[in-house]
From Swiss-Prot:
One of its GO terms (cellular component) is plasma membrane. The keyword Chaperone does not apply. This is Undecaprenyl-diphosphatase. The chain crosses the membrane at residues 11-31, 35-55, 80-100, 101-121, 135-155, 175-195, 202-222, 226-246. Catalyzes the dephosphorylation of undecaprenyl diphosphate (UPP). Its EC number is 3.6.1.27. It comes from the Archaea. The gene is uppP. It is found in: Cell membrane. It comes from Methanococcus maripaludis (strain C5 / ATCC BAA-1333). It is a multi-pass membrane protein. Belongs to the UppP family. It holds the Pfam family BacA. GO terms for molecular function: undecaprenyl-diphosphatase activity.
Length: 249
Protein backbone atom coordinates (compact mmCIF):
# COMPACT_ATOMS: atom_id res chain seq x y z
CA UNK A 1 0.00 0.00 0.00
CA UNK A 2 2.86 2.39 0.82
CA UNK A 3 4.41 1.88 -2.64
CA UNK A 4 1.03 2.57 -4.28
CA UNK A 5 0.52 5.81 -2.36
CA UNK A 6 4.07 6.96 -3.07
CA UNK A 7 3.54 6.19 -6.76
CA UNK A 8 0.45 8.39 -6.84
CA UNK A 9 2.24 11.15 -4.93
CA UNK A 10 5.24 11.05 -7.28
CA UNK A 11 3.12 11.07 -10.43
CA UNK A 12 0.91 13.98 -9.40
CA UNK A 13 3.57 16.12 -7.75
CA UNK A 14 6.47 15.61 -10.18
CA UNK A 15 5.07 18.20 -12.58
CA UNK A 16 2.83 20.23 -10.29
CA UNK A 17 5.04 22.96 -8.80
CA UNK A 18 4.79 21.64 -5.24
CA UNK A 19 7.92 19.41 -5.07
CA UNK A 20 7.57 15.68 -5.62
CA UNK A 21 10.69 14.87 -3.60
CA UNK A 22 9.39 16.93 -0.68
CA UNK A 23 6.04 15.14 -0.71
CA UNK A 24 7.65 11.72 -0.98
CA UNK A 25 9.75 12.56 2.08
CA UNK A 26 6.67 13.87 3.92
CA UNK A 27 4.63 10.74 3.26
CA UNK A 28 7.59 8.59 4.25
CA UNK A 29 7.69 10.46 7.57
CA UNK A 30 3.94 9.93 7.99
CA UNK A 31 4.43 6.20 7.38
CA UNK A 32 7.30 6.35 9.89
CA UNK A 33 9.62 4.53 7.51
CA UNK A 34 13.15 5.19 6.27
CA UNK A 35 13.32 7.30 3.08
CA UNK A 36 14.00 4.91 0.17
CA UNK A 37 15.89 7.26 -2.13
CA UNK A 38 16.45 4.43 -4.61
CA UNK A 39 12.72 3.81 -4.98
CA UNK A 40 12.08 7.55 -5.21
CA UNK A 41 14.55 7.70 -8.11
CA UNK A 42 12.90 4.66 -9.73
CA UNK A 43 9.60 6.53 -9.71
CA UNK A 44 11.36 9.36 -11.55
CA UNK A 45 11.76 7.00 -14.51
CA UNK A 46 7.98 6.57 -14.59
CA UNK A 47 7.41 10.31 -14.76
CA UNK A 48 10.23 10.56 -17.32
CA UNK A 49 8.19 8.31 -19.62
CA UNK A 50 5.08 10.40 -18.96
CA UNK A 51 6.73 13.68 -19.93
CA UNK A 52 8.40 12.04 -22.94
CA UNK A 53 4.94 11.15 -24.24
CA UNK A 54 3.58 14.61 -23.37
CA UNK A 55 6.28 16.47 -25.36
CA UNK A 56 6.86 13.79 -28.00
CA UNK A 57 6.14 16.19 -30.87
CA UNK A 58 8.70 18.71 -29.59
CA UNK A 59 11.27 15.94 -29.04
CA UNK A 60 10.65 14.64 -32.57
CA UNK A 61 11.06 18.14 -34.03
CA UNK A 62 14.37 18.61 -32.20
CA UNK A 63 15.73 15.20 -33.25
CA UNK A 64 14.53 15.70 -36.82
CA UNK A 65 15.99 19.21 -36.95
CA UNK A 66 19.37 18.03 -35.66
CA UNK A 67 19.44 15.20 -38.22
CA UNK A 68 18.89 17.80 -40.95
CA UNK A 69 21.59 20.03 -39.44
CA UNK A 70 19.07 22.81 -38.80
CA UNK A 71 20.95 25.40 -36.73
CA UNK A 72 17.76 26.54 -34.99
CA UNK A 73 17.18 23.09 -33.48
CA UNK A 74 20.87 22.45 -32.87
CA UNK A 75 20.98 25.66 -30.82
CA UNK A 76 17.82 24.67 -28.94
CA UNK A 77 19.28 21.25 -28.09
CA UNK A 78 22.50 22.93 -26.95
CA UNK A 79 20.55 25.27 -24.67
CA UNK A 80 18.64 22.35 -23.15
CA UNK A 81 21.92 20.53 -22.47
CA UNK A 82 23.36 23.71 -20.95
CA UNK A 83 20.31 24.01 -18.69
CA UNK A 84 20.88 20.52 -17.27
CA UNK A 85 24.57 20.94 -16.40
CA UNK A 86 24.14 22.79 -13.04
CA UNK A 87 21.76 20.14 -11.66
CA UNK A 88 24.05 17.32 -12.79
CA UNK A 89 27.05 18.93 -11.08
CA UNK A 90 25.14 19.53 -7.85
CA UNK A 91 23.71 16.01 -7.85
CA UNK A 92 27.09 14.36 -8.38
CA UNK A 93 29.02 16.55 -5.94
CA UNK A 94 26.51 16.80 -3.11
CA UNK A 95 24.58 13.53 -3.42
CA UNK A 96 25.22 12.39 0.17
CA UNK A 97 24.19 15.76 1.62
CA UNK A 98 21.03 15.84 -0.50
CA UNK A 99 20.11 12.33 0.67
CA UNK A 100 20.51 13.42 4.30
CA UNK A 101 18.13 16.36 3.78
CA UNK A 102 15.32 13.88 3.02
CA UNK A 103 15.33 13.02 6.72
CA UNK A 104 14.95 16.64 7.87
CA UNK A 105 11.27 17.57 7.91
CA UNK A 106 12.20 21.04 9.20
CA UNK A 107 14.25 21.83 6.09
CA UNK A 108 11.57 20.35 3.85
CA UNK A 109 9.02 22.67 5.46
CA UNK A 110 11.26 25.69 4.91
CA UNK A 111 11.93 24.75 1.29
CA UNK A 112 8.19 24.31 0.62
CA UNK A 113 7.66 27.90 1.80
CA UNK A 114 10.30 29.07 -0.68
CA UNK A 115 8.50 27.22 -3.47
CA UNK A 116 5.25 28.86 -2.39
CA UNK A 117 6.79 32.32 -2.63
CA UNK A 118 8.10 31.59 -6.13
CA UNK A 119 4.64 30.47 -7.26
CA UNK A 120 2.96 33.63 -5.97
CA UNK A 121 5.54 35.73 -7.78
CA UNK A 122 5.24 33.70 -11.00
CA UNK A 123 1.63 34.74 -11.57
CA UNK A 124 2.76 38.38 -11.67
CA UNK A 125 5.25 37.74 -14.48
CA UNK A 126 3.60 38.40 -17.84
CA UNK A 127 6.27 39.70 -20.21
CA UNK A 128 5.54 36.94 -22.76
CA UNK A 129 8.26 37.91 -25.23
CA UNK A 130 10.59 34.96 -25.78
CA UNK A 131 10.05 31.47 -27.17
CA UNK A 132 12.06 28.32 -26.46
CA UNK A 133 13.92 28.89 -29.72
CA UNK A 134 14.72 32.55 -29.14
CA UNK A 135 16.04 32.58 -25.57
CA UNK A 136 19.77 33.37 -25.33
CA UNK A 137 22.30 30.93 -23.89
CA UNK A 138 22.65 33.05 -20.75
CA UNK A 139 18.95 32.61 -20.02
CA UNK A 140 19.28 28.86 -20.53
CA UNK A 141 22.08 28.76 -17.96
CA UNK A 142 20.09 30.85 -15.46
CA UNK A 143 17.08 28.54 -15.74
CA UNK A 144 19.48 25.63 -15.25
CA UNK A 145 20.90 27.17 -12.08
CA UNK A 146 17.38 27.50 -10.69
CA UNK A 147 16.75 23.86 -11.55
CA UNK A 148 19.87 22.86 -9.61
CA UNK A 149 18.26 24.05 -6.36
CA UNK A 150 15.40 21.61 -6.92
CA UNK A 151 17.58 18.66 -5.92
CA UNK A 152 16.59 19.71 -2.39
CA UNK A 153 13.30 18.14 -1.19
CA UNK A 154 10.68 20.87 -0.92
CA UNK A 155 12.11 22.93 -3.77
CA UNK A 156 10.01 22.18 -6.84
CA UNK A 157 11.86 21.52 -10.10
CA UNK A 158 8.95 22.60 -12.28
CA UNK A 159 8.27 25.52 -9.93
CA UNK A 160 11.81 26.92 -10.01
CA UNK A 161 12.24 26.48 -13.76
CA UNK A 162 8.83 27.97 -14.56
CA UNK A 163 9.56 30.95 -12.32
CA UNK A 164 12.97 31.50 -13.91
CA UNK A 165 11.65 31.17 -17.47
CA UNK A 166 8.74 33.54 -16.83
CA UNK A 167 10.99 36.01 -15.00
CA UNK A 168 13.29 36.05 -18.03
CA UNK A 169 10.35 36.92 -20.29
CA UNK A 170 9.40 33.61 -21.86
CA UNK A 171 5.87 33.03 -23.11
CA UNK A 172 3.83 30.93 -20.70
CA UNK A 173 3.26 27.96 -23.00
CA UNK A 174 6.91 28.01 -24.05
CA UNK A 175 8.00 28.19 -20.41
CA UNK A 176 6.01 25.00 -19.73
CA UNK A 177 7.53 23.23 -22.74
CA UNK A 178 11.06 24.30 -21.88
CA UNK A 179 10.65 23.22 -18.26
CA UNK A 180 9.46 19.77 -19.32
CA UNK A 181 12.10 19.34 -22.03
CA UNK A 182 15.03 20.36 -19.83
CA UNK A 183 13.77 18.07 -17.10
CA UNK A 184 13.99 14.96 -19.29
CA UNK A 185 17.73 14.24 -18.90
CA UNK A 186 17.75 15.20 -15.21
CA UNK A 187 14.77 13.00 -14.39
CA UNK A 188 16.17 10.11 -16.42
CA UNK A 189 19.62 10.48 -14.89
CA UNK A 190 18.23 10.55 -11.34
CA UNK A 191 16.43 7.29 -11.98
CA UNK A 192 19.32 5.49 -13.65
CA UNK A 193 21.90 6.46 -11.00
CA UNK A 194 19.88 4.87 -8.20
CA UNK A 195 18.45 1.95 -10.18
CA UNK A 196 20.78 -0.60 -8.59
CA UNK A 197 19.16 0.13 -5.20
CA UNK A 198 15.68 -0.93 -6.37
CA UNK A 199 14.42 -4.41 -5.46
CA UNK A 200 11.80 -4.47 -8.26
CA UNK A 201 9.12 -6.03 -6.09
CA UNK A 202 5.57 -6.38 -7.42
CA UNK A 203 4.48 -3.49 -5.18
CA UNK A 204 7.23 -1.23 -6.51
CA UNK A 205 6.46 -2.09 -10.14
CA UNK A 206 2.77 -1.35 -9.52
CA UNK A 207 3.77 1.97 -7.96
CA UNK A 208 5.80 2.67 -11.11
CA UNK A 209 2.75 2.17 -13.35
CA UNK A 210 0.54 4.32 -11.12
CA UNK A 211 3.20 7.04 -11.07
CA UNK A 212 3.29 7.04 -14.88
CA UNK A 213 -0.49 7.37 -15.22
CA UNK A 214 -0.88 10.08 -12.59
CA UNK A 215 2.13 11.85 -14.11
CA UNK A 216 0.20 12.32 -17.34
CA UNK A 217 -2.63 13.89 -15.33
CA UNK A 218 -0.18 16.17 -13.53
CA UNK A 219 1.30 17.36 -16.84
CA UNK A 220 -2.13 18.33 -18.14
CA UNK A 221 -3.00 20.19 -14.95
CA UNK A 222 0.19 22.23 -14.71
CA UNK A 223 0.00 23.34 -18.35
CA UNK A 224 -3.59 24.47 -17.85
CA UNK A 225 -2.80 26.29 -14.60
CA UNK A 226 0.27 28.11 -15.95
CA UNK A 227 -1.50 29.37 -19.05
CA UNK A 228 -4.53 30.31 -16.95
CA UNK A 229 -2.38 32.33 -14.54
CA UNK A 230 -3.34 30.21 -11.52
CA UNK A 231 0.08 29.28 -10.14
CA UNK A 232 -0.78 31.14 -6.94
CA UNK A 233 -3.07 28.23 -6.04
CA UNK A 234 0.01 26.03 -5.84
CA UNK A 235 1.72 28.74 -3.82
CA UNK A 236 -1.03 28.73 -1.20
CA UNK A 237 -0.93 24.94 -1.11
CA UNK A 238 2.84 24.96 -0.51
CA UNK A 239 2.37 27.32 2.45
CA UNK A 240 -0.26 25.00 3.94
CA UNK A 241 1.97 21.96 3.38
CA UNK A 242 4.90 23.81 4.94
CA UNK A 243 2.82 24.71 8.00
CA UNK A 244 1.70 21.10 8.40
CA UNK A 245 5.25 19.77 8.14
CA UNK A 246 6.74 22.31 10.56
CA UNK A 247 3.96 21.89 13.12
CA UNK A 248 3.21 18.18 13.07
CA UNK A 249 6.19 16.25 11.67
Amino acid sequence: MEELILGIVQGLTEFLPISSSGHLAIFTAIFNSTPDVGYFAFLHLATFLAVLIFVKSEVFEIVNGISKKDNEYINLASKLVLSTIPAVIVGLCFGDFIESVFSSTFLIGVFLSITGILMLLSDKLNQNLKTIKSIPYLDAMIVGIFQAFSVLPGISRSGTTLFAALFLGMKKEDAVKYSFLMGLPVTFGAGILELQKVSFSAEQLFGFVISFLTGLLGLYLVKKMVIGGKLKIFGYYCFLASFFVLMFL
